[in-house]
């Protein structure tokens, strides 16, 4: 019979994402964080991005308070396209911007079984853009829901969901429908509300002991507000977004030592911003017009993107001490974004990969892997990785690892054509010869598993060196008296840090505490010159301040990026999640999350950095059983109970009106 990978993962310290092989955490080739179902429930979080606060060194922010941003290392930009995000191994990274639109992800948090996070480059297993790390969201199996469930949340959030599933001899299925909404921080300052309707289905057909067919479908439909009060160039407006996906996987067991998996997936997203400002002078009325909604400079922005992908993976047991996984895939990325791409763009990348796990001795494990890929833009890259794990004792493991990764330019960077679209005929330098970003990562890790005591200790020290980082190529446009942007490989950066995790379980595993801490430092330098770096022409914007265009450009990069790069990482950050099972079916949990001040890369230096965060959340739940496998749960959650108000990622300076303050909500759920 087929062995369920999900069942294996449910056992203590087994992971899948690091190498595509199910491995004990002590034999994986990289540092990993696992967020299981119990942690998800105890956290009281309503959305998947919030769960990333339980990962050491992870930045979690919200663009203008309603569009989640998640990334390791520095706080990146709104699209966070240096992180690979997977759902059941399927990349949800979409053109033309890259990154993930977390706000309209067609997945309910109730359908998440566990989340595995690789804290470090993983292109050897998951391809370009697995640059800083990988988040793999593993959903609940089709047979996990036998019956129905309902859930309603009220208070400072309004959520509803219904789930139903059935298990049979050859067919299992589950489906979910839900509605998630949030009014944001303060609608009088930011138009930051959001609402999404979600449908998700998973079905598994297993006609015999050798074959399994898994079908997944999902759809989300909704939108969110945009706009900042008092800014005519960023007026209040409503966006719409629709996302859907389909995934079909066939797993065949050739023998007890060989299996193959063939997967096809399709994903689509369509979004509309009805009133985007593309000329701030016109939008602010500095040109002639009587009404903001008839000013030149506004346009309707529509973005349509889709991805089709097929992948074959083979896993072999080559002997008692060796396992190999290998395969390849092709995909087709398509984006229609008239505002910047002028014409629709299509990319057709492909990749082949292999990973070998060799138990040299009982104590020594060597992981070797690589991926060779063509990015569809004329570049071929190889991303090798090597890790050596040594069991000092059955409970103590040391790991040394070296890996490389690449990040291919996204369509919006590589093919942006702003001439005659945004800047009214002003010359904008074309994007030319962008090359993939590169990273070299070196780490030393330790894992202590004190099984008798229920304690796990995980720690790592790392140095990550990034070359050819793509950055805005600032262009002073004399014909407009302002600026335009292109892109260029401009920067080299280095990240150094320490990450630690302590887990302790007691009361037969029903109670636990998880503590995380991360310390990071970062520095950067220009590795190439911006196009106008040496331009001696007079600066049209403010000749009294800048002696030339080149002087303006040099000051911009030094003061607004290089000097402030160290502020874009979470220097000190951490979390503590505690859950205690009490008498009479009560459960109490508390989560504490902290980080220092941080500056987001793509927010103007005129905007105050995000305040430090010291946040305490509490959850108290009561379960009432009324039959076999039937229960009702009432849970109350108070977030930021100490009212240590903090800002989220945004383009407006923090005031008392735009802070994350105390929030309270109540959830009632039942199974039947």
Which ranges hold each PLM region?
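Periplasmic-side early beta-strands and strand-to-turn transitions of outer-membrane beta-barrels
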Residues: 123-124, 136, 144-145, 163-242, ...
